[in-house]
């Protein structure tokens, strides 16, 4: 017990011995752009508006966190840990630890837990050395951000446990222009006995004692990405996925903010795991008020054995800092992902307006039906026609969701001569009154198999299964085990054959169920590594194909998928009112350029709601990939007459959506008049999306203040005169709406 003043003083001295006194900077190595400054004792990463500092305690070799926030220079004020007043004190748990290991007196959740062959889970990871690398190495087998030596600098800190011969390398890559620090960790077995990694975080940070709040994205099928903001309480709180994919339930995104932080003001820290598998986000406020945030593998889905010389690499975690509120945080993510994550040539290229056959026809079609739909699509001005589920399966034809998955050959009853004649006929059609040929796209779900399929009958061992336990069906299908190289090769070969057979310029890659009955905890990560190999091989082999990710909507809307697929279907819910919430929630981390959004028929297939076509179109064109999800023959004549104009408007705004900055002016959770402003990359153009959700009877409409404009410049506002940026931001503008579900799209031009 530390009941006496003498014992309290001794305890305080012990704390300082473990974690040192205040830090000072540096007789040091400095990168050419000053982004990394290090001397082996103290480390600093510097962006345009961010500083990240940590140090080594020279007595123990522990890494201690000092600062992650606004830019700082020079020496740091000498802080101290919590005083050891009366009572039992867990020493390590009272200080800010940069990469907390397990079993040495820190009883908060660790960043790493490793079981040795003897059963021990204690690690004593001490600082050994560091290296500074211009640019950024890729992660083996995993998606990762990229950049040149001018864009990014990487610091690698090497830790070592002398007792177990376990090495951990911590990687910090800073993109100064984006105030972004990307972290990952390697665990290497340098000993002779096997070890098992049971927990590993890509990112960990201990915030100082402050009142903080956390923001996450929760949901389920058809209601993804609902923003949730709550106070960080004492104790452990967090979320994650154990479904085998990032999932609709929780996105691998976290923001930490102050209670006073708003969209446009205050500090915000954002974290996003570049991973598509099961994950864990943990936030723990310890007894001393320090808040620990960790993102990484889900420990319940990880038991990774390492033999001598073997290494486990964690996914990357992107962290950004903004002093310009939650909106500033989002814009940093958007810019970074557009320029340094998405590798597709389509990352910032105009996306063709498309029509997808699903909600128009579902499974009920044949060659003539599809051609008729393509003809009507082209007449409206659509430039890409997509044939969704139902085109494949020979012995087990895909006429419902009961059969066919896994057999990627055209259904001979529907397409007796294969797809080639259909594709040739469709791609001869002209979009609207233009000379542009209609393009052809296809839906696939290659990671699945129906029990009613030739593939399953020939290879029942290829699906996920746990011995003799029943194989649980979901949507009448099973998951192929992409941990198996032969399964990966099969998928690569089948999709290659399809794309080589016809002029297919777009692929929608779906994934419609969770993973059950996995054979081992490590299988989840092995699956994801296999999936990334498939994605990388096919997107490299077919760089001119526009790939779109999907998982029953936004179930895999994560940075891992974005590296390979430049756009993702945001939600199966196409109801325009709900889509505003879903799309603005998704935009907390992900660029609107990556969102697939479609104008669908009414009453809406998911909600039964009827909303005017103009409102539906305006909501959909806020996504980078605008499309239609309907049968034009079923439209009312007045609706059909409006669609070509909406397609033309979507094409006009698309370049700004793809490369510009997004400002969420009002949120649908907080206002009857949500509004979003997009400003072009050069600042010369802007487009405002402004909505009225419910009726506004006998009451004034509020003024709307814009953001992000040049206060000294003058802007013309869609035929309503010219005004200074200062006037538009400080006074605002006001519009009259006619009814519920009314909307406006307003263009601004800098003069």
Curated annotation (Swiss-Prot):
It catalyses: Hydrolysis of terminal, non-reducing alpha-D-galactose residues in alpha-D-galactosides, including galactose oligosaccharides, galactomannans and galactolipids. The active site is at residues 510, 572. One of its GO terms (biological process) is polysaccharide catabolic process. One of its GO terms (cellular component) is extracellular region. Its EC number is 3.2.1.22. Its cofactor is Mg(2+); NAD(+). The keyword Magnesium applies. Glycans are attached at residues 49, 57, 162, 186, 194, 366, 433, 452, 500, 720. Its main location: secreted. Keywords: Carbohydrate metabolism, Glycoprotein, Glycosidase, Hydrolase, Magnesium, NAD, Polysaccharide degradation, Secreted, Signal. GO terms for molecular function: alpha-galactosidase activity. Residues 1-27 form the signal peptide. It is found in: Secreted. Hydrolyzes a variety of simple alpha-D-galactoside as well as more complex molecules such as oligosaccharides and polysaccharides. Homotetramer. Belongs to the glycosyl hydrolase 36 family. This is Probable alpha-galactosidase C. The lineage of its organism: Eukaryota, Fungi, Dikarya, Ascomycota, Pezizomycotina.
């Amino acid at each position: 017990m530390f009941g006496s003043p003498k014992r309290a003083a001794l305890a305080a001295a012990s704390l300082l011995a473990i974690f040192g006194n205040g830090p000072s900077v540096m007789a040091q190595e400095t990168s050419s752009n000053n982004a990394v400054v290090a001397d082996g004792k103290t480390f600093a990463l510097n962006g345009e508006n961010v500083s990240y500092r940590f140090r080594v305690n020279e007595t123990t070799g522990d890494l201690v966190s000092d600062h992650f926030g606004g830019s700082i220079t020079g020496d740091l004020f000498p802080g101290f840990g919590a005083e050891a007043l009366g009572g039992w004190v867990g020493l390590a748990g009272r200080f800010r630890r940069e990469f907390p290991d397990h079993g040495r007196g820190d009883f908060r959740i660790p960043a790493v837990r490793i079981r040795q062959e003897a059963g021990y889970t204690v690690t004593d990871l001490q600082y050994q050395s560091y290296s500074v690398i211009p640019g950024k190495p890729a992660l083996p087998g995993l998606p990762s951000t990229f950049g040149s030596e001018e864009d990014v600098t990487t610091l690698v800190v090497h830790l070592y446990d002398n007792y177990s011969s376990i090495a951990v390398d911590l990687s910090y890559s800073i993109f100064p222009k984006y105030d972004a620090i990307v972290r990952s960790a390697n665990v290497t077995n340098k000993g002779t006995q096997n070890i098992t990694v049971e927990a590993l975080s890509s990112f960990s940070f201990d915030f100082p004692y402050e009142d903080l709040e956390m923001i996450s994205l929760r949901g389920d099928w058809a209601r993804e990405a609902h923003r949730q903001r709550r106070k960080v309480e004492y104790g452990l709180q967090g979320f994650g996925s154990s479904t085998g994919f990032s999932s609709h339930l929780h996105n691998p995104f976290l923001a930490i903010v102050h209670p006073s932080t708003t969209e446009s003001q205050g500090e915000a820290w954002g974290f996003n795991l570049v991973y598509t598998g099961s994950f864990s986000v943990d936030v723990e406020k310890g007894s001393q008020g320090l808040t620990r945030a960790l993102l990484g593998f889900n420990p319940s889905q990880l038991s990774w054995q390492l033999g001598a010389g073997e290494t486990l690499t964690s996914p990357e975690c992107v962290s950004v800092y903004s002093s310009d509120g939650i909106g500033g945080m989002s814009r940093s993510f958007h810019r970074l992902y557009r320029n340094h994550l998405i590798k597709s040539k389509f990352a910032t290229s105009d996306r063709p307006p498309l029509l997808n056959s699903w909600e128009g026809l579902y499974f009920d079609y044949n060659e003539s039906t599809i051609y008729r739909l393509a003809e009507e699509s082209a007449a409206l001005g659509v430039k890409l026609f997509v044939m969704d589920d139902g085109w494949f399966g020979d012995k087990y034809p895909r006429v419902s969701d009961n059969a066919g998955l896994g057999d990627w050959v055209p259904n001979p009853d529907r397409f007796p001569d294969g797809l080639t004649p259909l594709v040739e006929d469709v791609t001869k059609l002209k979009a609207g009154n233009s000379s542009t040929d209609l393009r052809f796209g296809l839906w696939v779900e290659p990671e699945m198999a129906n029990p009613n399929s030739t593939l399953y009958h020939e290879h029942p061992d290829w699906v996920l299964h746990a011995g003799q336990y029943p194989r649980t069906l979901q949507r009448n299908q099973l998951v192929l085990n992409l941990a198996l190289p032969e399964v990966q090769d099969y998928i690569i070969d089948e999709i290659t054959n399809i794309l080589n057979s016809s002029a297919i310029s777009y692929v929608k890659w779906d994934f419609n169920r969770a993973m059950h009955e996995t054979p081992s905890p490590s299988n989840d990560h092995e699956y994801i590594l296999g999936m990334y190999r498939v994605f990388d091989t096919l997107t490299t082999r077919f760089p001119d194909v526009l790939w779109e990710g999907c998982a029953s909507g936004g179930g895999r809307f994560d940075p891992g998928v974005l590296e390979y697929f430049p756009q993702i279907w945001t939600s199966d819910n196409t109801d325009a009112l709900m889509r505003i919430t879903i799309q603005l929630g998704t935009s907390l981390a992900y660029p609107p350029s990556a969102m697939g959004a479609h104008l669908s028929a009414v009453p809406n297939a998911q909600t039964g709601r009827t909303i005017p076509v103009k409102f539906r179109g305006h909501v959909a064109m806020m996504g980078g990939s605008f499309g239609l999800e309907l049968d034009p023959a079923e439209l009312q004549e007045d609706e059909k007459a409006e669609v070509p104009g909406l397609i033309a408007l979507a094409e006009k705004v698309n370049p700004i959506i793809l490369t510009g900055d997004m400002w969420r002016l009002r949120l649908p959770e907080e206002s009857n008049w949500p509004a979003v402003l997009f400003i072009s990359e050069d600042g010369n153009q802007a487009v405002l999306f402004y909505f009225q959700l419910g009726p506004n009877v006998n009451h004034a409409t509020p003024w709307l203040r814009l953001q992000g404009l040049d206060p000294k410049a003058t802007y013309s506002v869609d035929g309503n005169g010219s005004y200074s940026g200062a006037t538009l931001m400080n006074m605002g503008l006001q519009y009259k709406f006619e009814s519920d579900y009314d909307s406006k799209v307003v263009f601004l031009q800098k003069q």
